């Protein structure tokens, strides 16, 4: 039986990138469905989507990456998809790795599979500051729930139908990737990584700067610790 796979593409002000990303999927990976979630873009992203007759959902205001991705998960769950794939709308993630992302889910080995640029350290490795932050989250997650994830902030990931349904009810609003790993593990879902090669952003500017990076680390750290404490109180015992 061929699995029903949906690619979720959250997009905020990606007028310079989104057409290339979607054209690549349509022309080379047509076996997968896709949905773009236009997260209240203030540039001409929506015009690009309409002009090209792309499949998209239009949010009336910016909900942040978490809200955009969760909207995609709700769409996937409502339409009966077996696997939901998240990729960024800036061209960094290569859909050629999707087959490798979904295979562990099909084999029953995982509920979430994350594409890591650090397992084989090929391709674009991001800035030294971001690498430091990613390494920090690797150790934090290991300390809190025992899982070792080398690329916890990677937005290139696949989720099973069961995990997708869970995310429709519980998903962090802002900078959700590390927290989604923690909540998945604590709730009994299996999480693993595979090596992928990522590219530099294809155009435009990232919304993450040095100041936002510091804010991101503080906010996500607090969110993860609070989530872990709440789970501990709920179960009355730690998971490690």
Predicted regions and their residues:
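Donor nucleotide-sugar binding loop of glycosyltransferases
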Residues: 14-17, 41, 94
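Short beta-strand-to-loop acidic/aromatic patch adjacent to the donor-nucleotide binding site
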Residues: 81-92
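Catalytic donor-sugar/metal-binding loop of nucleotide-sugar-dependent glycosyltransferases
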Residues: 147-148, 169-172, 181-199
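Cell-envelope/extracellular polymer assembly enzymes that use nucleotide-activated donors
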Residues: 4-6, 33, 179
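Acceptor/aglycone-binding surface of glycosyltransferases and processive sugar-polymer synthases
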Residues: 59-61, 65-78, 95-174, 201-222, ...
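Short, well-formed alpha-helical segments that are part of the catalytic scaffolds
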Residues: 13-27
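A conserved acidic beta->alpha catalytic loop
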Residues: 38-46, 91
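Short hydrophobic beta-strand elements that form part
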Residues: 6-10, 36, 58
